[in-house]
Amino acid sequence: MGDIYFVRHAESDIRVHDEFLRPLTEKGLRDSALITNYLKDKDISYIYSSPYIRAVDTVKELADELNISITSIDHFKERRISSWIDDFDSFSKRQWNDFDYSLADGECLKEVQIRNVTALMELVQSHPEANCVIGSHGTALSTIINHFNPHFGFESFSKIKALMPWIVKITFEHHNFIKMESIDIFKNNEITPINLEKSELVNK
């Protein structure tokens, strides 16, 4: 049995509109230590990340602590948007209501989901018994959750929109999905099962 710990990046500086280069804020850098404290004793063998700076920097302290190099995987990057969006909530709701909707030169959620889930399952095939960490993003990670639990939609996404950093643990056995759990490091590492019958995150 292997556990995949997805780590949604810590708070980033939204004054920087470049998706690739946007850094963590000072608070984000401090909060990354909470990720390290939680994961450093989880027998982690591999650390992967989206190539975006904010995702890499969120797991960098953990990688240094465990002396594990971070492998960047392009497929784990955040949804591509053609330009900066001021009314993110309206745009996000429209995308969650229609997985095929996108702006010109942007990605729809179906595309984001396919590339993220494909990359995830390739890692599961490569390391079936290993515990791995993956530096990720809010929307990208949420589409992965939706793949395994279709009840996770816009309402659930809205609940975690401001939760940065955030850990989602996905357990596999013999390449088969077993369960998902949400870990809130700001609430004494509170663990909430993400059930297949419903999204518990909606009802909290």
Predicted segments, located by residue:
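Generic beta-sheet signal
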Residues: 4, 128-139
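Short beta-strand scaffold positions
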Residues: 49-50, 114, 135-136
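Glycine-rich phosphate-binding loop signature in dinucleotide/nucleotide-binding domains
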Residues: 41-43, 123-130
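Conserved histidine-centered catalytic loops in small-molecule metabolism enzymes
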Residues: 44-75, 146-149, 171-204
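Phosphate-handling substructures
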Residues: 64-118
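Domain-level recognition of soluble alpha/beta enzyme cores
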Residues: 151-179
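Active-site-proximal alpha-helix that buttresses catalytic centers in soluble enzyme cores
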Residues: 2-70, 110, 164
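Short active-site segment of divalent metal-dependent hydrolases/proteases
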Residues: 12, 140-141
